[in-house]
Protein backbone atom coordinates (compact mmCIF):
# COMPACT_ATOMS: atom_id res chain seq x y z
CA UNK A 1 0.00 0.00 0.00
CA UNK A 2 1.50 3.34 -1.04
CA UNK A 3 1.11 6.12 1.51
CA UNK A 4 0.05 9.56 0.27
CA UNK A 5 3.13 11.29 -1.09
CA UNK A 6 3.99 14.64 0.46
CA UNK A 7 6.62 16.68 -1.41
CA UNK A 8 9.37 17.73 0.99
CA UNK A 9 10.29 21.39 1.44
CA UNK A 10 7.35 22.32 -0.79
CA UNK A 11 7.07 25.90 0.47
CA UNK A 12 10.74 26.92 0.09
CA UNK A 13 10.99 25.22 -3.30
CA UNK A 14 7.86 27.04 -4.50
CA UNK A 15 9.07 30.36 -3.11
CA UNK A 16 12.63 30.21 -4.42
CA UNK A 17 11.76 28.90 -7.89
CA UNK A 18 8.60 31.00 -8.05
CA UNK A 19 10.69 34.13 -7.51
CA UNK A 20 12.52 33.63 -10.83
CA UNK A 21 11.41 36.25 -13.34
CA UNK A 22 10.42 35.58 -15.98
CA UNK A 23 9.40 32.02 -15.07
CA UNK A 24 8.14 30.40 -18.24
CA UNK A 25 10.00 27.07 -18.41
CA UNK A 26 10.57 24.70 -15.51
CA UNK A 27 12.54 21.48 -15.90
CA UNK A 28 11.87 18.97 -13.13
CA UNK A 29 14.58 16.36 -13.57
CA UNK A 30 13.24 14.00 -10.90
CA UNK A 31 9.52 14.41 -11.42
CA UNK A 32 8.38 11.63 -9.09
CA UNK A 33 4.71 12.13 -8.28
CA UNK A 34 4.84 15.70 -9.56
CA UNK A 35 4.05 17.36 -6.23
CA UNK A 36 6.52 20.24 -6.45
CA UNK A 37 5.74 20.88 -10.11
CA UNK A 38 2.00 20.90 -9.49
CA UNK A 39 2.37 23.69 -6.93
CA UNK A 40 4.41 25.80 -9.34
CA UNK A 41 2.09 25.16 -12.29
CA UNK A 42 -0.91 26.19 -10.19
CA UNK A 43 0.78 29.40 -9.08
CA UNK A 44 2.15 30.42 -12.49
CA UNK A 45 -0.40 30.16 -15.34
CA UNK A 46 2.21 30.85 -18.04
CA UNK A 47 4.60 28.16 -16.83
CA UNK A 48 5.48 25.18 -19.02
CA UNK A 49 6.88 21.99 -17.48
CA UNK A 50 9.34 19.48 -18.88
CA UNK A 51 9.28 16.61 -16.39
CA UNK A 52 11.81 13.78 -16.49
CA UNK A 53 11.91 10.54 -14.50
CA UNK A 54 13.50 7.16 -15.09
CA UNK A 55 10.70 5.36 -13.24
CA UNK A 56 7.73 4.75 -15.54
CA UNK A 57 5.44 4.10 -12.57
CA UNK A 58 6.30 7.53 -11.18
CA UNK A 59 5.58 9.11 -14.55
CA UNK A 60 2.16 7.45 -14.64
CA UNK A 61 1.32 8.83 -11.20
CA UNK A 62 2.59 12.28 -12.16
CA UNK A 63 0.53 12.27 -15.35
CA UNK A 64 -2.61 11.69 -13.30
CA UNK A 65 -1.65 14.28 -10.68
CA UNK A 66 -0.87 16.93 -13.30
CA UNK A 67 -3.91 16.21 -15.46
CA UNK A 68 -5.38 19.69 -14.89
CA UNK A 69 -2.23 21.18 -16.47
CA UNK A 70 -1.78 18.60 -19.24
CA UNK A 71 -1.61 21.24 -21.98
CA UNK A 72 1.44 22.78 -20.28
CA UNK A 73 3.26 19.56 -19.39
CA UNK A 74 5.66 17.35 -21.31
CA UNK A 75 6.61 14.19 -19.40
CA UNK A 76 9.59 12.12 -20.52
CA UNK A 77 10.99 8.75 -19.47
CA UNK A 78 14.72 9.33 -19.13
CA UNK A 79 17.60 10.35 -16.89
CA UNK A 80 18.12 13.89 -15.68
CA UNK A 81 21.81 13.68 -16.57
CA UNK A 82 20.57 13.71 -20.18
CA UNK A 83 18.44 16.82 -19.68
CA UNK A 84 20.25 18.86 -22.34
CA UNK A 85 19.51 16.32 -25.07
CA UNK A 86 15.94 15.81 -23.81
CA UNK A 87 15.32 19.56 -23.69
CA UNK A 88 16.71 20.03 -27.21
CA UNK A 89 14.50 17.21 -28.50
CA UNK A 90 11.46 19.11 -27.23
CA UNK A 91 12.50 22.49 -28.58
CA UNK A 92 13.91 23.94 -25.36
CA UNK A 93 17.12 25.90 -25.77
CA UNK A 94 17.23 26.76 -22.07
CA UNK A 95 15.25 26.61 -18.83
CA UNK A 96 14.34 29.37 -16.40
CA UNK A 97 14.36 27.03 -13.41
CA UNK A 98 15.49 23.47 -12.75
CA UNK A 99 14.56 21.24 -9.82
CA UNK A 100 16.33 18.05 -8.73
CA UNK A 101 14.97 16.01 -5.80
CA UNK A 102 17.68 13.38 -5.37
CA UNK A 103 17.39 9.82 -4.11
CA UNK A 104 14.71 7.21 -3.59
CA UNK A 105 11.09 8.36 -3.35
CA UNK A 106 8.54 7.44 -0.70
CA UNK A 107 6.38 5.43 -3.16
CA UNK A 108 9.45 3.41 -4.20
CA UNK A 109 10.23 2.66 -0.55
CA UNK A 110 6.61 1.78 0.22
CA UNK A 111 6.31 -0.84 -2.53
CA UNK A 112 7.87 -4.08 -1.24
CA UNK A 113 8.10 -5.50 -4.76
CA UNK A 114 10.54 -2.74 -5.74
CA UNK A 115 13.05 -4.01 -3.18
CA UNK A 116 14.24 -0.64 -1.86
CA UNK A 117 13.32 -1.11 1.80
CA UNK A 118 14.78 -3.57 4.29
CA UNK A 119 11.76 -3.14 6.56
CA UNK A 120 9.53 -5.33 4.37
CA UNK A 121 10.32 -8.42 2.35
CA UNK A 122 10.68 -8.20 -1.40
CA UNK A 123 13.04 -9.09 -4.24
CA UNK A 124 16.57 -7.66 -4.29
CA UNK A 125 15.75 -5.27 -7.11
CA UNK A 126 16.25 -1.54 -6.27
CA UNK A 127 16.08 -0.37 -9.90
CA UNK A 128 14.64 3.10 -10.41
CA UNK A 129 14.52 2.34 -14.12
CA UNK A 130 12.96 -1.10 -14.27
CA UNK A 131 14.11 -1.53 -17.85
CA UNK A 132 17.80 -1.69 -16.93
CA UNK A 133 19.56 -5.03 -16.40
CA UNK A 134 21.54 -4.44 -13.19
CA UNK A 135 19.71 -5.28 -9.95
CA UNK A 136 20.71 -5.43 -6.30
CA UNK A 137 20.59 -9.22 -6.52
CA UNK A 138 23.23 -9.10 -9.24
CA UNK A 139 25.45 -6.85 -7.13
CA UNK A 140 25.12 -8.87 -3.92
CA UNK A 141 25.44 -12.30 -5.49
CA UNK A 142 27.98 -11.74 -8.27
CA UNK A 143 30.20 -8.72 -7.56
CA UNK A 144 33.71 -9.50 -6.36
CA UNK A 145 34.48 -9.17 -2.65
CA UNK A 146 36.76 -6.15 -3.19
CA UNK A 147 34.11 -4.34 -5.22
CA UNK A 148 31.51 -5.05 -2.56
CA UNK A 149 33.81 -3.69 0.16
CA UNK A 150 34.37 -0.53 -1.87
CA UNK A 151 30.63 -0.03 -2.43
CA UNK A 152 29.75 -0.54 1.25
CA UNK A 153 32.58 1.76 2.33
CA UNK A 154 32.12 4.58 -0.20
CA UNK A 155 28.37 4.56 -0.74
CA UNK A 156 27.17 3.28 2.64
CA UNK A 157 29.96 4.78 4.72
CA UNK A 158 29.95 1.44 6.54
CA UNK A 159 32.83 1.16 9.02
CA UNK A 160 32.97 -2.63 8.79
CA UNK A 161 32.70 -2.70 5.00
CA UNK A 162 35.46 -5.26 4.42
CA UNK A 163 34.19 -7.58 7.14
CA UNK A 164 30.66 -7.43 5.77
CA UNK A 165 31.74 -7.94 2.14
CA UNK A 166 33.70 -11.05 3.15
CA UNK A 167 30.73 -12.42 5.08
CA UNK A 168 28.48 -11.84 2.06
CA UNK A 169 30.92 -13.69 -0.21
CA UNK A 170 31.06 -16.68 2.16
CA UNK A 171 27.29 -16.82 2.61
CA UNK A 172 26.39 -16.54 -1.08
CA UNK A 173 28.81 -19.36 -1.95
CA UNK A 174 26.53 -21.64 0.06
CA UNK A 175 23.27 -20.12 -1.15
CA UNK A 176 22.60 -16.85 -3.02
CA UNK A 177 20.69 -14.09 -1.28
CA UNK A 178 17.05 -14.13 -2.41
CA UNK A 179 15.25 -11.23 -0.75
CA UNK A 180 15.45 -8.02 1.22
CA UNK A 181 14.38 -9.51 4.57
CA UNK A 182 17.08 -12.17 4.35
CA UNK A 183 19.75 -9.58 3.61
CA UNK A 184 18.54 -7.27 6.39
CA UNK A 185 18.64 -10.11 8.93
CA UNK A 186 22.11 -11.06 7.71
CA UNK A 187 23.28 -7.47 8.26
CA UNK A 188 22.34 -7.64 11.93
CA UNK A 189 23.80 -11.14 12.33
CA UNK A 190 27.20 -10.03 11.00
CA UNK A 191 27.36 -6.41 12.14
CA UNK A 192 25.27 -6.51 15.29
CA UNK A 193 22.52 -4.15 16.37
CA UNK A 194 22.77 -0.49 15.49
CA UNK A 195 23.80 1.87 18.27
CA UNK A 196 21.11 4.19 19.68
CA UNK A 197 20.92 7.45 17.76
CA UNK A 198 22.69 6.00 14.72
CA UNK A 199 21.20 4.95 11.39
CA UNK A 200 20.25 1.27 11.32
CA UNK A 201 23.08 -0.71 9.73
CA UNK A 202 20.75 -2.29 7.12
CA UNK A 203 19.90 1.27 6.02
CA UNK A 204 23.57 1.88 5.18
CA UNK A 205 23.91 -1.43 3.33
CA UNK A 206 20.74 -0.88 1.32
CA UNK A 207 21.74 2.71 0.55
CA UNK A 208 25.07 1.51 -0.82
CA UNK A 209 23.46 -1.11 -3.03
CA UNK A 210 20.83 1.32 -4.32
CA UNK A 211 23.45 3.92 -5.23
CA UNK A 212 25.47 1.29 -7.10
CA UNK A 213 22.48 -0.18 -8.93
CA UNK A 214 21.28 3.21 -10.14
CA UNK A 215 24.63 4.94 -10.63
CA UNK A 216 23.26 7.76 -8.49
CA UNK A 217 26.41 9.74 -7.72
CA UNK A 218 27.62 9.75 -11.32
CA UNK A 219 24.10 10.71 -12.38
CA UNK A 220 24.21 13.60 -9.91
CA UNK A 221 27.65 14.82 -11.03
CA UNK A 222 26.62 14.79 -14.68
CA UNK A 223 23.18 16.21 -13.90
CA UNK A 224 24.56 19.21 -12.03
CA UNK A 225 26.86 20.09 -14.93
CA UNK A 226 24.00 19.65 -17.40
CA UNK A 227 21.70 21.85 -15.30
CA UNK A 228 24.20 24.70 -15.14
CA UNK A 229 24.68 24.50 -18.90
CA UNK A 230 20.95 24.40 -19.65
CA UNK A 231 19.89 27.26 -17.37
CA UNK A 232 19.48 30.62 -19.03
CA UNK A 233 21.54 33.47 -17.57
CA UNK A 234 19.74 34.48 -14.39
CA UNK A 235 18.04 31.08 -14.13
CA UNK A 236 17.89 29.15 -10.87
CA UNK A 237 18.72 25.59 -9.82
CA UNK A 238 17.21 24.01 -6.70
CA UNK A 239 18.56 20.68 -5.43
CA UNK A 240 17.10 18.60 -2.59
CA UNK A 241 19.29 15.85 -1.13
CA UNK A 242 18.82 13.45 1.75
CA UNK A 243 22.19 12.11 2.82
CA UNK A 244 25.69 13.43 3.29
CA UNK A 245 27.21 11.86 0.16
CA UNK A 246 24.77 13.71 -2.08
CA UNK A 247 24.85 16.95 -0.14
CA UNK A 248 28.66 17.14 -0.09
CA UNK A 249 28.71 16.65 -3.85
CA UNK A 250 26.07 19.35 -4.43
CA UNK A 251 27.77 21.76 -2.02
CA UNK A 252 31.17 21.31 -3.66
CA UNK A 253 29.75 21.78 -7.16
CA UNK A 254 27.89 24.96 -6.26
CA UNK A 255 30.81 26.46 -4.37
CA UNK A 256 33.18 25.81 -7.27
CA UNK A 257 30.70 27.25 -9.79
CA UNK A 258 30.46 30.39 -7.65
CA UNK A 259 34.23 30.89 -7.30
CA UNK A 260 35.57 33.95 -9.08
CA UNK A 261 39.24 32.97 -8.85
CA UNK A 262 40.77 29.49 -9.02
CA UNK A 263 44.41 30.53 -8.63
CA UNK A 264 46.52 28.56 -6.14
CA UNK A 265 46.49 30.18 -2.69
CA UNK A 266 49.36 32.55 -1.98
CA UNK A 267 49.57 34.33 -5.34
CA UNK A 268 49.67 38.12 -4.84
CA UNK A 269 47.31 38.79 -7.78
CA UNK A 270 44.82 36.74 -9.77
CA UNK A 271 46.26 35.37 -13.01
CA UNK A 272 43.72 32.64 -13.82
CA UNK A 273 41.23 34.80 -15.71
CA UNK A 274 38.43 32.60 -14.37
CA UNK A 275 34.98 34.05 -13.77
CA UNK A 276 32.23 32.66 -11.59
CA UNK A 277 29.47 30.85 -13.48
CA UNK A 278 26.96 31.14 -10.64
CA UNK A 279 26.01 32.92 -7.45
CA UNK A 280 24.62 31.44 -4.24
CA UNK A 281 21.60 33.42 -3.02
CA UNK A 282 21.48 31.22 0.08
CA UNK A 283 24.62 30.42 2.05
CA UNK A 284 24.29 26.95 3.46
CA UNK A 285 21.19 24.79 3.31
CA UNK A 286 17.46 25.25 3.76
CA UNK A 287 15.88 22.60 6.00
CA UNK A 288 12.37 21.70 7.07
CA UNK A 289 10.79 23.43 10.04
CA UNK A 290 9.35 21.55 13.00
CA UNK A 291 5.81 21.63 11.62
CA UNK A 292 6.83 19.96 8.36
CA UNK A 293 8.91 17.31 10.13
CA UNK A 294 5.94 16.54 12.39
CA UNK A 295 3.79 15.99 9.30
CA UNK A 296 6.41 14.17 7.21
CA UNK A 297 9.31 12.47 9.00
CA UNK A 298 11.25 12.06 5.76
CA UNK A 299 11.63 15.85 5.62
CA UNK A 300 13.92 15.77 8.68
CA UNK A 301 16.94 14.77 6.58
CA UNK A 302 16.13 16.92 3.52
CA UNK A 303 18.56 19.68 2.54
CA UNK A 304 17.78 22.27 -0.13
CA UNK A 305 20.54 24.22 -1.89
CA UNK A 306 19.97 27.05 -4.36
CA UNK A 307 22.22 28.33 -7.16
CA UNK A 308 21.68 31.09 -9.75
CA UNK A 309 23.43 31.16 -13.10
CA UNK A 310 25.35 34.38 -13.62
CA UNK A 311 23.84 36.93 -15.99
CA UNK A 312 26.47 38.28 -18.38
Give short role names for the model-derived ranges.
Residues 1-312:
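S-adenosyl-L-methionine-dependent methyltransferase catalytic core, i.e., the SAM/SAH-binding region
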Amino acid sequence: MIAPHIPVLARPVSEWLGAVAPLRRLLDGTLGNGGHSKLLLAAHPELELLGIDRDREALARAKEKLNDFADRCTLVHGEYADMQAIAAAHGWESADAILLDIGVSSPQLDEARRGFSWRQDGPLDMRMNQEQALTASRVVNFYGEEDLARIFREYGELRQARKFAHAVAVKRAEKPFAGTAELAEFCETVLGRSRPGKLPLPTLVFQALRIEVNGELEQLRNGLRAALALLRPGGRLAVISFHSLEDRLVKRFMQEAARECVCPPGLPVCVCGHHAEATLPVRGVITADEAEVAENRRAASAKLRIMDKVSR
